[in-house]
Amino acid sequence: MGLRKTGLALAAVLALGACQNGGIFGGGANGAGQTPSSGNIEESSLAYFNTTIGDTVLFVVNEATLGDAAKAILDAQVAWLNQYPDRTITIEGHADEQGTREYNLALGARRAAAVRNYMVSAGLLETRLSIVSYGKERPLAVCSTEACWAKNRRSVTVVAGGIGNV
């Protein structure tokens, strides 16, 4: 009986894993990927922020310049964050695995700073923001193709605080 329950639990986990959207970071350079439908998610929730607004913007190789698609996502993030003033954010800067650890940490810091500066200029209080660079230390995918590396050239806005943290 215990083996049967374990087998059913394993089957459920595998079935859910098969449903995961691996293609969430499409789109082109200086933008962000497509986001899945939000369904009936509470607008104040982190799930809404992550899936409907988007928590990630992408960058071109060796650049920390924000493109129009990235700015549009950041504008939406600022508008959402201004509705929920109890929320704070950490902006994570990331790079692909090419280059040295030191170079990529500096590049990640420049990317996070570019996002912070844009968000402050768009009306978000600087006291609600912090930045961190992970360089190439936290890739979304470990790979050796340009298409795959592009997913790792990003900044991620991580939201904290508030009641609706689901």
Regions found by a protein language model. Give the residues of each.
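Bacterial N-terminal signal peptides that target proteins for export
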Residues: 1-8
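Periplasmic peptidoglycan-binding/tethering modules of Gram-negative envelope proteins
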Residues: 20-88, 161-166
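A generic structural micro-feature
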Residues: 147-151
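Extracytoplasmic/secreted proteins, especially bacterial periplasmic and envelope-associated proteins
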Residues: 69-76, 102, 110, 114, ...
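Short beta-alpha junctions and helix-cap segments that line functional grooves
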Residues: 141-145
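A non-catalytic structural micro-motif
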Residues: 85-94, 109-140, 153-166
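C-terminal motif of bacterial Sec signal peptides marking the signal peptidase cleavage site
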Residues: 15-18
